Design a protein with these regions (language model features):
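Catalytic Walker B motif of ABC-type/P-loop ATPase nucleotide-binding domains
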Residues: 174-177
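A short, surface-exposed alpha-helical micro-motif characterized by mixed small hydrophobic
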Residues: 212-214
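Conserved ABC ATPase "signature" region
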Residues: 127-145
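Conserved ABC ATPase signature
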Residues: 149-153, 157
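Conserved beta-strand-loop-alpha-helix hinge in the C-terminal portion
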Residues: 226-248
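H-loop/switch region of ABC-family ATPase nucleotide-binding domains
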Residues: 206-207
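Conserved ABC transporter NBD signature motif
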Residues: 74-83, 91
Length: 251
């Protein structure tokens, strides 16, 4: 059964070609470790891209810059709006970041309260909040879970609820860190089908190269804080020398 398309990018984004634009982004941690070196790339409206590379490549660090959790030197734009301290709340509503561990995202007693948290803090009327929650739960095929206790769910169910918590904000860009990690085959397949059907621009960091091959038309390869390749997924996966040099395996 296809998911509902009631979850869609915010109206301001529909006519914007570049949903995401990163220009010459550099970042070093307080201990002096340099994690990002001149990262630049764009994503178009509706595009789905995989972000791959070995552990320590800088993938998670990059993702934490896209909604302002970390702030380096360079520029990040979402829908033509540059990320600054003044517009940080608006940017965070536009960028739905889903962490690898769903327990980092689910902290309310019930599923409904978790998914409603963002819209409530936007100051929306109760009726609008309920509508957003129902649409988000329907989109991740969890409509019957609204009154369940979040901490009693399976890992796969928690990951879908974590996605719903950001979908309820009607984001323009969905950013996921290792979404298939720790899932059994059935839960993994359910997740892949969900990501395929969601009508939203998507950047997904993953080591699951089989999912990359199946789901993403574009693949960005990172290593040592740099983008070392960016192209069509078939071309990237056919380049065995590239994969070997950067610790990746052909699916």
């Amino acid at each position: 059964m296809p998911v509902s398309h009631s979850i869609s990018p915010s109206p301001a984004m529909i006519h914007t070609a570049d949903v995401l634009c990163v220009r010459d982004l550099h970042f070093s941690y307080p201990d002096g470790h340099s994690a990002l070196h001149g990262i630049s790339f764009k994503m178009n409206n509706g595009e789905k891209a995989a972000l791959v590379g070995p552990n320590g490549a800088g993938k998670s660090t990059l993702m934490l810059h896209l909604n302002g959790i970390l702030g380096g030197h360079g520029e990040v734009e979402i829908g033509g709006k540059r990320l600054t301290r003044d517009n940080l709340p608006a940017i965070r509503a536009m960028v739905g970041l889903v962490f690898q561990n769903p327990d980092d995202q689910l902290f309310s007693p019930t599923v409904f309260e978790d998914v409603a948290f963002g819209p409530l803090h936007m100051g929306l009327p109760e009726e609008d909040v309920r509508a957003r929650v129902e649409a988000a739960l329907e989109a991740v095929r969890m409509s019957g879970y609204r009154d369940r206790l979040s901490h009693h769910l399976s890992v796969g169910e928690k990951k879908r609820i974590a996605i719903a918590t950001v979908l309820s904000m009607n984001p323009s860009l969905l950013v996921l860190d290792e979404p298939s990690a720790g899932l059994d085959p059935r839960a993994r397949r359910t997740l892949i089908n969900l990501l395929r059907e969601l009508p939203i621009t998507m950047l997904v960091s993953t080591h699951d190269m089989t999912m990359v091959k199946e789901l993403f038309p574009r693949t960005i390869v990172m290593d040592e804080g740099k983008i070392v390749a960016d192209g069509s997924t078939p071309e990237i996966l056919d380049d065995e020398k590239l994969l070997t040099e950067h610790g990746l395996e052909k699916p």
